[in-house]
UniProtKB/Swiss-Prot annotation:
GO MF term (any one): heme binding
Keywords: Chloroplast, Cytochrome c-type biogenesis, Membrane, Plastid, Thylakoid, Transmembrane, Transmembrane helix
Membrane-protein topology: Multi-pass membrane protein
Gene: ccsA
Protein name: Cytochrome c biogenesis protein CcsA
Gene Ontology terms describing biological process: cytochrome complex assembly
Biological source species: Chlorella vulgaris (Green alga)
Amino acid sequence: MMVNIPVIENFLSNSCFLILFLTTVYYWLKIGFGGKSSFSFTGLTGYGSALCCLTLQLILRWVDSGHFPLSNLYESLIFLAWCLLLLYIYIEVSTKTLFLGVLTSPAILCLVAFTDFSLPTELQQSTPLVPALQSNWLVMHVTVMIASYAALLLGCFIAIAYLVLSKFFIKTTFVTAPLSSQNTVLRQESFLEEKQKTDIVFEKNDKNLKFLFFLDNLSYRTIGIGFCFLTLGILSGAIWANETWGNYWSWDPKETWAFITWLTFACYLHSRLVGGWTGSKPALVASFGFLVVWVCYLGVNLLGQGLHSYGFLNV
């Protein structure tokens, strides 16, 4: 009996979207109703199930096409979502914090929705590799580059979350009610009551500041990992370009924006390592980098120009 791979792929993609939607609702309801912000087995189960759906989808396309599924924009977006899910699962297991799921689950859900429901059907079909892509460097270069995009985007998104949350947390004021008195004698009950209120406020703000520090540090580490992958991806791409076209660098739009992306995050890391920046300043640089990564990944490819336009919109 013939296996209808497109039907199975459609089922897997729809299942992935539904699972991510339910997982997003779960995270928001858990936080909204005052649930614990610690490790969540249910949330991770949802993410793990979505990751399995994407993994099976990539394997099916690999078997059907005979090559690693990175020949067009649709397949690269699936792999990007796969990398984001894998990286997030690792972060949540390592940090044991639930609040990151509240921030990242809607972003990953939107990416999967765009991939499944916005791209034209023609672009979602498996296509043979053009001669320039028929190389062992395809897996090495493209997978590393997309993995770098995933790490950089997630790190930048956490930095943006830091900027938004800091507006609410840092501006919190410690306001306490005046102590009650009667005949200039301070009652012990009133003093204890007001002291308890003050301690609660300070404890809450101390937790908020610690969480902001956690986000700042997590963003820094995630972007650092992404920068290493980006550097490796650019170097492997240069070697592949020399083997294919006879020169290491041709300054086509994709290469130019990859270099701009590298410079942006090199400045970010330099400001932190050498300049000692922390908090809002590097988060602003990362926010700019968030846009740069999307231009490098999607914007240039949508133009359909340059040596890197293979397999994207010119199908």
